[in-house]
From Swiss-Prot:
The keyword Coiled coil does not apply. Residues 107-126 are annotated as: Disordered. One of its GO terms (cellular component) is cytosolic large ribosomal subunit. Homodimer. Part of the ribosomal stalk of the 50S ribosomal subunit. Forms a multimeric L10(L12)X complex, where L10 forms an elongated spine to which 2 to 4 L12 dimers bind in a sequential fashion. Binds GTP-bound translation factors. It comes from the Bacteria. This is Large ribosomal subunit protein bL12. One of its GO terms (biological process) is translation. The gene is rplL. It comes from Bifidobacterium adolescentis (strain ATCC 15703 / DSM 20083 / NCTC 11814 / E194a).
Amino acid sequence: MAKYTNDELLEAFGEMTLVELSEFVKAFEEKFDVEAAAPVAAVAAAPAAGAAAEEEKDEFDVILSAVGDKKIQVIKAVRAITNLGLAEAKALVDGAPKAVLEKAKKEDAEKAKSQLEEAGATVELK
């Protein structure tokens, strides 16, 4: 049996049409019981790595999801966290769900979340 170099094989493949190459790949997969789509699994794993990097982010948005029963305490907490005036803080609380802080450091976001939850609000970090 004649042995072909990679260059010779590439030259032969270069002369084939896409239909001929597709048929060749199918025949190759059947003969050697393999799948040409295997590298796709490696590509699918890449987003998982991206998700892990996303979990390690250092900036968070503090979202006021719901006010709860203690609206006045929540307004006071929003004023303390954001240094907003009374009217602005009330408008923010009345417009929930809204961002109280955006792109805050993790420790600041956790502190704000804790203060708002103590006041009776429902808060999430994004």
